[in-house]
Amino acid sequence: MDERLVSSELDNHESAIEQSLRPQRLAQYIGQEKVKDNLKVFIEAAKMREETLDHVLLYGPPGLGKTTLAAIIANEMGVNLRTTSGPAIERPGDLAAILTALEPGDVLFIDEIHRLHRSIEEVLYPAMEDFCLDIVIGKGPSARSVRLDLPPFTLVGATTRVGLLTAPLRDRFGVLSRLEYYTRDELSEIVIRTAELFEVDIDSLSALEIARRSRGTPRIANRLLRRVRDFAQVLGNSSITEEVAVDALERLQVDKLGLDHIDRKLLMGMIEKFGGGPVGIDTISATIGEESHTIEDVYEPYLLQIGFIQRTPRGRIVTPDVYSHFKMEVPNHD
């Protein structure tokens, strides 16, 4: 898969940069107002009762701030954050080692929690419900179960695919919060904040121009800002003006809706070779040279969100909005 500026997934080399940009408190966190307001109440109530916060499940598309919120929850509660991920916990013993190392009140963040193996989930159930760990010592007829007490802790799980969570695991979370795509104004505010951290001058129109092409996702907005900053420093006077921003984004082939060359390749392939559809996902895959699951998981979600593609029983079709965007006539199929 080609590297994409508009991918909402985190590149390995971006981790340190993202870490430096993350807000530390709810008051600094831009957007997700309903989620923030509810978390503020739950956190304050837990602190007033001197209890741990209920387990929290954060779900929604990638790049919207789930990891950031987990760290903020720990900061607001005044406790340590322990971080791991579903794929990193390969055996029940791995989870047991993590749980027994927790201090009272700690926040344990498990990213991609939907990828936990079922056998590991079963170890997690009593830990979440009763703060205890059941381990089996020995093998065969002499094997016996021993229960270990754990310190009270808060589990924060994050997932982009909440439908893959088992019902027993999902039901053990007391707080379930869905993160939504950001508005253009919220993204513009994030761009301005990030520019300040980068010590780069930017005006409001330039920030809006970057925001409108960021697909509702802060991670993409910050990535585009970094690339626009490069153009401003090399080709301009280091300040980001609207003219510099538009020129840079056009050079980067990210259009006014945030579509890139791969989006255009997919959409134009459907139009030019299949009359706009309906066309099956496997056929699209063969046409543009991408795996079917990559199209479904990476490319389609945004195109569905903005109404450029529809799924039908007979396959995918492009909508009239696509023809309008590309300044093409809508074909008459009558």
Curated annotation (Swiss-Prot):
Region (Small ATPAse domain (RuvB-S)): 183-253
NCBIfam families (UniProt xref): PRK00080.1, ruvB
Sorted UniProt keywords: ATP-binding, Cytoplasm, DNA damage, DNA recombination, DNA repair, DNA-binding, Hydrolase, Nucleotide-binding
SMART domains xrefs: AAA
Reaction(s) the record says it catalyses: ATP + H2O = ADP + phosphate + H(+)
Annotated spans, Head domain (RuvB-H): 256-334
Localization in the cell: Cytoplasm
Annotated positions binding DNA: 311, 316
Chain positions recorded as Mg(2+) binding sites: 67
Signal peptide: none
UniProt free text on domains: Has 3 domains, the large (RuvB-L) and small ATPase (RuvB-S) domains and the C-terminal head (RuvB-H) domain. The head domain binds DNA, while the ATPase domains jointly bind ATP, ADP or are empty depending on the state of the subunit in the translocation cycle. During a single DNA translocation step the structure of each domain remains the same, but their relative positions change.
Residues at which ATP binds: 21-22, 63, 66-68, 129-131, 172, 182, 219
GN (gene name): ruvB
Stored InterPro entries: AAA+_ATPase, AAA_lid_4, DNA_helicase_Holl-junc_RuvB, P-loop_NTPase, RuvB-like_N, RuvB_C, WH-like_DNA-bd_sf, WH_DNA-bd_sf
E.C. designation(s): 3.6.4.-
GO terms for MF: ATP binding; ATP hydrolysis activity; four-way junction DNA binding; four-way junction helicase activity
Presence of the UniProt keyword Ribosomal protein in the record: no
Function: The RuvA-RuvB-RuvC complex processes Holliday junction (HJ) DNA during genetic recombination and DNA repair, while the RuvA-RuvB complex plays an important role in the rescue of blocked DNA replication forks via replication fork reversal (RFR). RuvA specifically binds to HJ cruciform DNA, conferring on it an open structure. The RuvB hexamer acts as an ATP-dependent pump, pulling dsDNA into and through the RuvAB complex. RuvB forms 2 homohexamers on either side of HJ DNA bound by 1 or 2 RuvA tetramers; 4 subunits per hexamer contact DNA at a time.
Listed Pfam families: AAA_lid_4, RuvB_C, RuvB_N
Main localization, broad class: cytoplasm
Region (Large ATPase domain (RuvB-L)): 1-182
A Gene Ontology biological process term: DNA repair
Recorded GO CC terms: cytoplasm; Holliday junction resolvase complex
Name of the featured protein: Holliday junction branch migration complex subunit RuvB
Family (UniProt): Belongs to the RuvB family.
Subunit structure comment from the entry: Homohexamer. Forms an RuvA(8)-RuvB(12)-Holliday junction (HJ) complex. HJ DNA is sandwiched between 2 RuvA tetramers; dsDNA enters through RuvA and exits via RuvB. An RuvB hexamer assembles on each DNA strand where it exits the tetramer. Each RuvB hexamer is contacted by two RuvA subunits (via domain III) on 2 adjacent RuvB subunits; this complex drives branch migration. In the full resolvosome a probable DNA-RuvA(4)-RuvB(12)-RuvC(2) complex forms which resolves the HJ.
